[in-house]
């Protein structure tokens, strides 16, 4: 192994934490030895390259129940585990993207006086960023407005880094349904969304009659495949690595509103129907969705208000055909596309790379 400095990346759980960290890591791996810290039995092992030396902790997010004290005790024990890892691997810098693995990592790093950078991708900062952000050397923000929630932190707006595929044009995979009908990408994030899946199943007859083409990503949350006798216009998958190609080439995305998804839609200039996860902490998914809804590039439907009728009426409105100068077009969809083009893009991973490499001068 070359005599590079050692960077510990602490990111685990959902794609919203893992994918931004992966995007940054690939930008800086030429100057740093990468060590990755994740959580046992999560998505980490499926996505983290073996060369990044994945280590895992057996830790769970605290819940409001009788086992709360026990769970915080496990976080404390995890802090000692992280201290041991930091010493063993001779870590020079820690980069984390939030989530419950971040708390013991930040505490351990500060006890050893190792600099820490945390990236907060949501508009409303998560619990770890709120409570431990002041211990970090930098808190990097996915949205400028997040700064107002973190008055005691050293914040810098960088945007949220995306997977490399989103920064280049991709061809539509050949397994996607072919035809002239509008292409819908329906997904619920890396873990899936039962509510979105259910409303889609209830509306499939309507969608097939309207000749929509559908790619349905059901997610990894142990949901069973539905045995559906549908036309060739419907494809169902648990997960795909070609999500950038799907979003870039579809007509409309129907999804949750995690920060990663919001930024992928902005980069791809793609209109959407967003159905925020109602139990997200601080209602951050709804706040994320409002960014695109306020810009006119998305329609926000709260899960408590969604129904087969509302879903179908919304699609009919978006895809209502208007005639202009003898040509047919989708007036509302075209307006949503134009509004998405006006959202500012930022090459976030390049900005974050600057801050990580800044610490090279300190060693």
From Swiss-Prot:
<dbReference type="InterPro" id="IPR006009">
    <property type="entry name" value="GlcNAc_MurG"/>
</dbReference>
<comment type="function">
    <text>Cell wall formation. Catalyzes the transfer of a GlcNAc subunit on undecaprenyl-pyrophosphoryl-MurNAc-pentapeptide (lipid intermediate I) to form undecaprenyl-pyrophosphoryl-MurNAc-(pentapeptide)GlcNAc (lipid intermediate II).</text>
</comment>
<dbReference type="GO" id="GO:0009252">
    <property type="term" value="P:peptidoglycan biosynthetic process"/>
</dbReference>
<dbReference type="Pfam" id="PF04101">
    <property type="entry name" value="Glyco_tran_28_C"/>
</dbReference>
<dbReference type="GO" id="GO:0051301">
    <property type="term" value="P:cell division"/>
</dbReference>
<feature type="binding site">
    <location>
        <position position="285"/>
    </location>
    <ligand>
        <name>UDP-N-acetyl-alpha-D-glucosamine</name>
    </ligand>
</feature>
<dbReference type="GO" id="GO:0005975">
    <property type="term" value="P:carbohydrate metabolic process"/>
</dbReference>
<protein>
    <recommendedName>
        <fullName>UDP-N-acetylglucosamine--N-acetylmuramyl-(pentapeptide) pyrophosphoryl-undecaprenol N-acetylglucosamine transferase</fullName>
        <ecNumber>2.4.1.227</ecNumber>
    </recommendedName>
</protein>
<keyword id="KW-0133">Cell shape</keyword>
<comment type="similarity">
    <text>Belongs to the glycosyltransferase 28 family. MurG subfamily.</text>
</comment>
<comment type="pathway">
    <text>Cell wall biogenesis; peptidoglycan biosynthesis.</text>
</comment>
<keyword id="KW-0808">Transferase</keyword>
<dbReference type="GO" id="GO:0005886">
    <property type="term" value="C:plasma membrane"/>
</dbReference>
<keyword id="KW-0131">Cell cycle</keyword>
<feature type="binding site">
    <location>
        <position position="122"/>
    </location>
    <ligand>
        <name>UDP-N-acetyl-alpha-D-glucosamine</name>
    </ligand>
</feature>
<feature type="binding site">
    <location>
        <position position="190"/>
    </location>
    <ligand>
        <name>UDP-N-acetyl-alpha-D-glucosamine</name>
    </ligand>
</feature>
<dbReference type="Pfam" id="PF03033">
    <property type="entry name" value="Glyco_transf_28"/>
</dbReference>
<dbReference type="GO" id="GO:0050511">
    <property type="term" value="F:undecaprenyldiphospho-muramoylpentapeptide beta-N-acetylglucosaminyltransferase activity"/>
</dbReference>
<dbReference type="GO" id="GO:0008360">
    <property type="term" value="P:regulation of cell shape"/>
</dbReference>
<dbReference type="GO" id="GO:0030259">
    <property type="term" value="P:lipid glycosylation"/>
</dbReference>
<dbReference type="InterPro" id="IPR004276">
    <property type="entry name" value="GlycoTrans_28_N"/>
</dbReference>
<keyword id="KW-0472">Membrane</keyword>
<keyword id="KW-0997">Cell inner membrane</keyword>
<keyword id="KW-0328">Glycosyltransferase</keyword>
<keyword id="KW-0132">Cell division</keyword>
<feature type="binding site">
    <location>
        <position position="163"/>
    </location>
    <ligand>
        <name>UDP-N-acetyl-alpha-D-glucosamine</name>
    </ligand>
</feature>
<keyword id="KW-1003">Cell membrane</keyword>
<feature type="binding site">
    <location>
        <begin position="14"/>
        <end position="16"/>
    </location>
    <ligand>
        <name>UDP-N-acetyl-alpha-D-glucosamine</name>
    </ligand>
</feature>
<keyword id="KW-0573">Peptidoglycan synthesis</keyword>
<dbReference type="InterPro" id="IPR007235">
    <property type="entry name" value="Glyco_trans_28_C"/>
</dbReference>
<dbReference type="GO" id="GO:0051991">
    <property type="term" value="F:UDP-N-acetyl-D-glucosamine:N-acetylmuramoyl-L-alanyl-D-glutamyl-meso-2,6-diaminopimelyl-D-alanyl-D-alanine-diphosphoundecaprenol 4-beta-N-acetylglucosaminlytransferase activity"/>
</dbReference>
<dbReference type="GO" id="GO:0071555">
    <property type="term" value="P:cell wall organization"/>
</dbReference>
<keyword id="KW-0961">Cell wall biogenesis/degradation</keyword>
């Amino acid at each position: 192994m070359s005599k590079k400095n050692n960077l510990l990346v602490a990111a685990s759980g959902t794609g919203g934490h893992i994918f931004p960290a992966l995007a940054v890591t690939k930008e800086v791996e030429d100057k740093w030895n990468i060590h990755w810290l994740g959580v046992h039995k999560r998505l980490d092992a499926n996505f983290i390259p073996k060369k990044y030396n994945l280590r895992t902790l057996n830790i769970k997010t605290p819940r409001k129940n009788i086992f709360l004290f026990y769970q915080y005790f496990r976080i404390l024990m995890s802090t000692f585990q992280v201290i041991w890892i930091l010493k063993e691997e001779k870590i020079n810098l820690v980069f984390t993207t939030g989530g419950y693995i971040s708390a013991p990592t930040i505490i351990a790093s500060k006890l050893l006086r190792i600099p820490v950078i945390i990236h907060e991708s949501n508009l409303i900062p998560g619990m770890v960023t709120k409570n431990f952000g002041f211990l970090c050397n930098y808190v990097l923000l996915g949205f400028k407005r997040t700064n107002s929630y973190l008055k005691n932190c050293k914040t810098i707006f960088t945007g949220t880094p995306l997977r490399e595929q989103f920064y280049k044009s991709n061809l539509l995979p050949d397994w996607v349904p072919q035809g002239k009908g509008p292409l819908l990408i329906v997904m619920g994030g890396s873990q899936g969304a039962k509510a979105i899946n259910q409303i889609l199943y209830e509306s499939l007859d309507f969608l097939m009659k309207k000749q929509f083409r559908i790619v349905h990503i059901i997610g990894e949350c142990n949901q069973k495949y539905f045995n559906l006798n549908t036309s060739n216009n419907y494809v169902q998958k648990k997960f795909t690595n070609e999500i950038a190609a799907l979003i870039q080439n579809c007509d409309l995305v129907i999804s949750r509103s995690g920060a990663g998804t919001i930024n992928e839609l902005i980069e791809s200039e793609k209109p959407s129907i967003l159905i925020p996860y109602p139990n997200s902490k601080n209602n951050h998914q709804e706040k994320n969705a409002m960014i695109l809804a306020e810009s006119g590039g998305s329609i926000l439907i709260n899960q408590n208000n969604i129904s087969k009728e509302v879903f179908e009426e919304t699609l009919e409105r978006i895809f209502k055909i208007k005639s202009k100068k003898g040509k047919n077009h989708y007036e509302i969809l075209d307006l949503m596309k134009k509004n998405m083009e006006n959202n500012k893009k930022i090459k976030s991973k390049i900005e974050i790379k600057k801050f990580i490499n800044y610490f090279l001068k300190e060693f």
